[in-house]
């Protein structure tokens, strides 16, 4: 599909004209898993800005406007302080910058746990403000009824089990889950409960590989791993992590590039040229 996409290469910072490529839908994603198998794994990355979305869109099946933006964009210590307004602002930008991927937006901590009605109000707000296709919420069996409530009212839901960052204060850190029998059973049961509720996909995060594989085989919905297993039905990473924007990243991250070093070298060159007055040159100035 990506071969028909023409990446906008204009110098304008304005949004490019939409390309002749049909946007994927939630049913497309759900249908990728047939009889318990996904022939081509789903590709998902996080996106927080329109330009980032433009660059990622043709390579991905899904773009996740993750509440990880709290740490990545705002420098917050965790995802807990992220607000609905933050998510709405970034979600709208990502939708404007994409034409192919299914855009999923995280429901931030405190926006859906109190009641199913609260969850619906928050999810409806996010979808109306952004144009995103679906919301993602953390939690398994405890959130299954909420997921079903949203689905019955026209809001597609992606689930999230295993290590759930919004519960970091309860979990006591970011250690991998599923090492004990009790944890392993809970992860599988959580995934099954969400699947029965009708979610179209389930993120499995920070889970020991055998349990991630077991959970994937136990559900009809595609699973998307992050620190889980290559045998999940897809994968997701925080884009800035895989690009090498940060010195410290979780063990499960593969750095495909060292963009931080590229930026450092580039800015150092710019600063040097400004200080020695070699920038701007005649090529960058207007003459009479």
Question: Where are each of the predicted segments found?
Answer:
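Alpha/beta enzyme core
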Residues: 2-288
């Amino acid at each position: 599909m990506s071969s028909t996409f023409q990446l906008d290469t204009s110098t304008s910072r304005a949004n490019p004209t939409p390309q002749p490529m049909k946007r994927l839908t939630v049913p497309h994603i759900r249908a990728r898993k047939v009889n318990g198998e996904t022939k081509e794994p789903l590709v998902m990355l996080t996106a927080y800005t329109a330009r980032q979305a433009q660059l990622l869109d043709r390579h991905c099946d899904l773009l996740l406007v993750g509440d990880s933006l709290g740490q990545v964009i705002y420098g917050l210590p965790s995802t807990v302080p992220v607000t609905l307004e933050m998510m709405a602002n970034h979600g709208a930008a990502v939708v404007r910058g994409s034409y192919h991927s299914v855009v999923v937006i995280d429901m931030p901590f405190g926006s859906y746990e109190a009641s199913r009605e609260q969850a619906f109000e928050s999810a409806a707000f996010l979808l109306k403000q952004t144009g995103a296709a679906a919301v993602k919420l953390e939690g398994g069996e405890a959130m299954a009824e909420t997921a079903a409530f949203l689905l019955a009212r026209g809001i597609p839901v992606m689930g999230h089990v295993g290590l759930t960052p919004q519960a970091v204060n309860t979990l006591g850190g970011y250690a991998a889950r599923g090492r004990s029998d009790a944890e392993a059973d809970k992860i599988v049961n959580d995934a099954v409960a969400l699947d029965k509720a009708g979610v179209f996909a389930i993120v499995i995060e920070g889970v020991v590989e055998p349990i991630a594989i077991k959970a994937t085989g136990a559900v009809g919905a595609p699973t998307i791993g992050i620190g889980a297993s290559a045998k999940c039905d897809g994968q997701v990473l925080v884009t800035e992590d895989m690009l090498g924007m940060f010195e410290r990243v979780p063990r499960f991250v593969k750095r495909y590039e060292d963009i931080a070093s590229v930026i450092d070298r580039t800015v150092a060159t710019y600063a040097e040229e400004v200080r020695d007055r070699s920038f701007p040159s005649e090529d960058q100035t207007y003459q009479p």
